[in-house]
C-alpha cells in the first residue's frame, strides 16, 4: 500500500496543476464585468484575457517540459508556482488595464511551467502501479478545476468583486508548494542538456501565427498557412538536433497520438462551452452570473466522478472501449445540449452538461496514462509538455472559433450560439476516432528508443 508521503505528494501536485485551468476559466462568469472595465466588447476581451492566456500557455508547454528534464521537475514547478502567485497579486492589487494584461501573461507563462512538470513528477515520483490511478485523479482534477473555475469566479464576483478571483490563487499556490517541498524526493538523475532557444522561438512563432490567424471577424489564411509552414519546419528541425525541445518520434506510439488528439479536441469543446454559457445566458436570457455558475456544478461533479471511474473501466473493458464509450456519451450529451432554444434558465441544461462532464472525465485519464507510459521515464518532461501543448492548443482554438462565431457586437444572438455546435460535434468525432488508435487491453506500450 502506498505510504502517506505518496498521497500527500499527489495532493500537492494536484493542487498545483489545478491552478492552470482555474486561471483560464475562473474569469469566465466575470467577463461581462471585466469587459466593461476594459471598455471592450465581451468577445474581444475574451480573446485578449482568455485566448491570450491560452496562447502563451501553449507556446510554453513543450519548452517548460524540456527545461524540467534539464533542471529537475521540482525546481521548474517551484518557479512556476512563484511566478503564478506574483502575477495573481499584481492583478488584485493594481487596477489598470495594462497591469491586468501583464499579470495574465505572467500567470500564463507560469501555468506552462506548472502543468508538464506536475505531470512529469507523477511519472517519476510515484510507483508505476499507482500511475493509472494517479493520472485518473490528475485528469479529473484538471477537468474539474476548469469546470469549477466559473463557479468559484462567479461566487467571488457576486460577494466581493472580480479582482478577488486572482487573490484566491495565492493561498492555494502556497499550500501546493508546501506539500510538494515536504514530500517530494530529490531528482538525483538529471539529463545533461540545454534548451534549444532557436527551436523555442520557432515554435512560438508557429503557434502564435496559428492562433492569431483565428482572431478577428474572419480567418486570416495568410497567418494560418504561415503557422503550418513554420510548425512543419519546427518538426523537421527537431528530428535533426541533438537536444530537441520536443521529440516528434513520440508520435510513433499510437497511444501517444491518441492521448494528444483526445486531449486537444476534448479541451476544444470544454473550454468553448465554459465560455459560451455565461455569454449566452447573460445576452440571450438575461440571467444573473451566479445562476450560471451554479449550473456548471453539474459538469464539475460529474468530471470528478468520471476520473476515478476511468481507471476502473480501463481494467474491466480495456482502454480502447473505455475511450470509445466515453466519446459516444459525450456526443449524446452534445445532442441534448444542442436544444439551446429551449434552455430558458441554466438549470435546463444540467443533464447534457453532466453527461459531457462525466464523459470528459472518464476518457482523458486512461488515455493520458497510456500515452505517458509509452514514453521513456527520462523523457517524461518532453512527453508531458507535448500533451500539455495539445491540451492548450485545443482550448485556445475552441475559444477562437467561439469568438469568431459570436462576432464583435456588444450582444450576441441565439442563432450565433447555435452556429458553434457543429464545431463541437466535429471535435468530438475526432475524439471518437482517436479511441481506435489505442490497444484493446490495458497493457502499456513499449517505450520508444532514440533512433
Predicted regions and their residues:
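Transmembrane-helix bundle of Major Facilitator Superfamily
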Residues: 1-182, 309, 316-317, 324-331, ...
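12-transmembrane solute porter fold
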Residues: 6-22, 27-29, 50, 243-445
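Residue-level signal for the membrane-embedded core of alpha-helical transmembrane segments
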Residues: 59, 113, 205-208, 272, ...
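Small-residue hotspots
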Residues: 87, 103, 110, 176, ...
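Residue-level signal for alpha-helical transmembrane segments in multi-pass membrane proteins
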Residues: 90, 175-183, 209-212, 230-237, ...
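Hydrophobic transmembrane-helix bundles of small-molecule transporters
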Residues: 158-262, 269, 288, 294-295, ...
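Short, intrinsically disordered terminal tails adjacent to the first/last structured region
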Residues: 447-451
Amino acid at each position: 500500500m502506498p505510504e502517506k508521503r505518496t498521497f500527500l505528494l499527489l495532493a500537492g501536485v494536484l493542487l498545483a496543476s489545478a491552478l492552470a485551468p482555474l486561471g483560464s476559466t475562473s474569469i469566465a462568469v466575470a467577463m461581462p464585468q471585466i469587459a466593461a472595465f476594459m471598455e471592450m466588447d465581451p468577445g474581444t476581451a475574451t480573446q485578449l484575457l482568455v485566448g491570450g492566456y491560452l496562447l502563451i500557455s501553449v507556446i510554453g508547454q513543450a519548452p517548460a517540459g524540456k527545461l524540467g528534464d534539464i533542471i529537475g521537475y521540482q525546481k521548474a514547478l517551484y518557479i512556476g508556482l512563484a511566478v503564478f502567485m506574483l502575477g495573481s497579486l499584481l492583478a488584485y492589487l493594481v487596477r489598470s488595464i495594462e497591469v491586468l494584461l501583464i499579470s495574465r501573461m505572467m500567470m500564463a507563462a507560469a501555468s506552462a511551467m506548472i502543468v508538464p512538470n506536475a505531470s512529469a513528477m507523477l511519472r517519476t515520483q510515484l510507483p508505476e502501479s499507482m500511475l493509472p490511478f494517479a493520472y485518473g485523479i490528475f485528469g479529473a482534477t484538471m477537468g474539474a478545476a476548469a469546470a469549477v473555475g466559473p463557479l468559484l469566479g462567479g461566487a467571488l464576483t457576486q460577494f466581493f468583486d472580480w479582482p478577488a478571483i486572482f487573490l484566491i490563487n495565492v493561498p492555494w499556490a502556497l499550500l501546493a508548494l508546501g506539500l510538494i517541498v515536504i514530500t517530494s524526493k530529490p531528482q538525483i538523475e538529471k539529463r545533461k542538456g540545454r534548451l534549444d532557444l532557436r527551436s523555442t522561438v520557432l515554435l512560438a512563432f508557429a503557434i502564435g501565427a496559428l492562433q492569431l490567424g483565428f482572431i478577428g471577424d474572419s480567418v486570416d489564411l495568410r497567418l494560418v498557412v504561415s503557422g503550418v509552414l513554420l510548425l512543419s519546419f519546427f518538426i523537421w528541425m527537431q528530428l535533426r538536433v541533438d537536444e530537441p525541445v520536443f521529440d516528434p518520434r513520440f508520435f510513433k506510439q499510437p497511444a501517444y497520438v491518441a492521448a494528444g488528439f483526445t486531449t486537444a479536441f476534448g479541451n476544444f469543446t470544454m473550454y468553448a462551452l465554459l465560455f459560451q454559457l455565461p455569454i449566452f445566458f447573460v445576452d440571450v436570457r438575461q440571467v444573473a452570473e451566479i445562476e450560471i455558475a451554479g449550473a456548471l456544478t453539474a459538469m464539475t461533479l460529474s468530471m470528478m466522478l468520471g476520473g476515478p471511474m476511468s481507471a476502473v473501466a480501463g481494467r474491466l473493458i480495456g482502454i480502447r472501449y473505455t475511450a470509445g464509450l466515453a466519446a459516444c456519451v459525450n456526443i449524446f450529451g452534445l445532442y441534448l445540449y444542442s436544444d439551446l432554444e429551449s434552455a430558458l434558465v441554466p438549470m435546463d441544461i444540467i443533464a447534457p452538461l453532466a453527461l459531457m462532464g462525466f464523459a470528459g472525465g472518464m476518457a482523458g485519464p486512461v488515455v493520458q496514462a497510456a500515452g505517458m507510459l509509452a514514453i521513456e521515464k527520462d523523457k517524461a518532461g518532453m512527453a508531458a509538455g507535448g500533451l500539455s501543448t495539445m491540451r492548450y492548443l485545443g482550448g485556445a482554438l475552441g475559444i477562437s472559433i467561439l469568438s469568431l462565431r459570436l462576432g464583435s457586437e456588444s450582444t450576441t444572438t441565439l442563432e450565433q450560439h447555435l452556429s458553434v455546435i457543429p464545431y463541437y460535434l466535429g471535435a468530438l468525432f475526432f475524439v471518437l476516432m482517436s479511441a481506435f488508435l489505442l490497444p484493446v487491453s490495458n497493457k502499456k506500450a513499449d517505450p520508444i528508443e532514440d533512433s
